[in-house]
From Swiss-Prot:
The gene is arsC. The keyword Cytoplasm applies. Keywords: Arsenical resistance, Cytoplasm, Disulfide bond, Oxidoreductase, Redox-active center. This is Arsenate reductase. Its main location: cytoplasm. It holds the Pfam family LMWPc. PANTHER family: ARSENATE REDUCTASE (PTHR43428:SF1). GO terms for biological process: response to arsenic-containing substance. Belongs to the low molecular weight phosphotyrosine protein phosphatase family. Thioredoxin-coupled ArsC subfamily. It comes from Brevibacillus brevis (strain 47 / JCM 6285 / NBRC 100599). Catalyzes the reduction of arsenate [As(V)] to arsenite [As(III)].
């Protein structure tokens, strides 16, 4: 994983929020961070998440829906949980790994504007982190 830090975005199904976060992370943090995402379960990438990101010029059609990889988890410099479910049932993390929770609504099963809103909120939060480190 070179000399880059590693950030790991986690949510319940690695279908919507963490997929969008991975894409935004690669856009805003890719020069300094290895960016990964995963879920407690792997539900497949939601087609509306793909569509929402495509609308802002980011192609996530090749991203895969993955369950949490303990190797990445243990080597991560920062773990970001994106929903309360992942925050509460996330595997125990090593003490050297910084873990934060950035909660976002789950757009799965909702109307299209909800995907756009959540996409934009996640993008803004990751951009802020890229700019401020917080």
């Amino acid at each position: 994983m070179e000399n880059k830090k590693t950030i790991y975005f986690l949510c319940t199904g690695n279908s919507c929020r963490s997929q969008m976060a991975e894409a935004w992370g690669k856009k805003y943090l890719g020069n300094a961070w290895n960016v990964f995402s995963a879920g407690i379960e792997a539900h497949g990438v939601n087609p509306n998440a793909v569509r929402a990101m495509k609308e802002v010029g980011i192609d996530i059609s090749d991203q895969t829906s993955d369950v949490i990889d303990s190797d990445i988890l243990n080597k991560a410099d920062l773990i970001v949980t994106l929903c309360s479910h992942a925050d509460s049932v996330c595997p125990t993390t090593p003490t050297h790994v910084n873990r934060v929770h950035w909660g976002f609504d789950d757009p799965a099963g909702k109307e299209w504007p909800e995907f756009q809103r959540v996409r934009d909120e996640i993008g803004a939060r990751i951009k802020k982190f890229a700019e401020t480190g917080e």
